[in-house]
Amino acid sequence: MLKVFRLGYVDFVTKDFEKLSEYYSEIIGFSKTFESHESAYFSSSTDHHNIALHASHFTGIQRIGLQLHADISVQDAAKWLNNEGINTTVKTEARPGVPELAEFTDQDGYIIQLFSSMEVAASGFIRNSIAPNKVGHLSLRVKDAKRSVEFYKLLGFTNTDWIETFFGFMTCNSDHHVLNFCTSPEKAGEMHHLAFELRDYSHLAASLDFLGKHEIPILWGPSRHGAGHNIATYHHDPDGNVIELFTDADVYIRELNRFEP
């Protein structure tokens, strides 16, 4: 079994590169750390990047980056995955700020990249924007949530919660969930939502005011969830991707296999 400890980055393809770039820099408040004529990389604070955008004729999620524990090399991770029958390729200098990664495609077509190190940007938080703490979690539509939960245990994830039998929650650290999987056979391979963690409820309230000022409608919330008990709200980004802003989620204590509020 491998050990990853956080969700490092998420890549999107977009038909409107300029508009989505503006959303992440001006609304979310991430710093642009690298840009080419068809790609842009954004950092929440100190990582080289946490969001990457790529111009395309399509719209949606493209890649997911998970960071390995320091005692596991990219080469060793790739070897282990290949021995498990998961076709994995090692790539060097494949993306800015990440010298080496191991890439495979999961059962639902999501491209997963495992990396052990990333350059530091030290860009800090941007004022006059939402400025989340971090990329909090990613929710994915899959053919079978139970199957996905079992698969991601291979990467060191722990199953922390369920909504009935169709929505499974998993963590690789102290967050209630880092990934979750929603059984949606007809939409498998599409993102359900991407969530950004905020500091506290006052930060969430101020962020809702900020969205209103920029005429971005709220789809739902704020309300407190059952799974994780986070206070959350949702809106669409310019491409129609669902974005969650949340705070006050349960903290997972792995050694005790229980949560603290």
Question: What is each PLM-predicted segment?
Answer:
Residues 20-25, 81, 109, 148-152, ...:
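Conserved active-site tyrosine of GNAT-family acetyltransferases
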Residues 72-79, 204-209:
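Short amphipathic alpha-helices within nucleic acid-binding modules
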Residues 29-62, 110-118, 162-192, 197-201, ...:
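Conserved short beta-strand elements that form part of the metal-binding/catalytic scaffold
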Residues 1-18, 61-66, 118-146, 161, ...:
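N-terminal beta-strand motif that seeds the catalytic metal site of vicinal oxygen chelate
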Residues 78-131, 168-169, 215-261:
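Vicinal oxygen chelate
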Residues 65, 71-74, 84:
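Eukaryotic helix-linker segments that join adjacent hydrophobic helices
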Residues 130-208, 212-214:
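Surface-exposed interaction/gating patches
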Residues 2-49, 93-95, 140-177:
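Core segments of cupin and vicinal oxygen chelate
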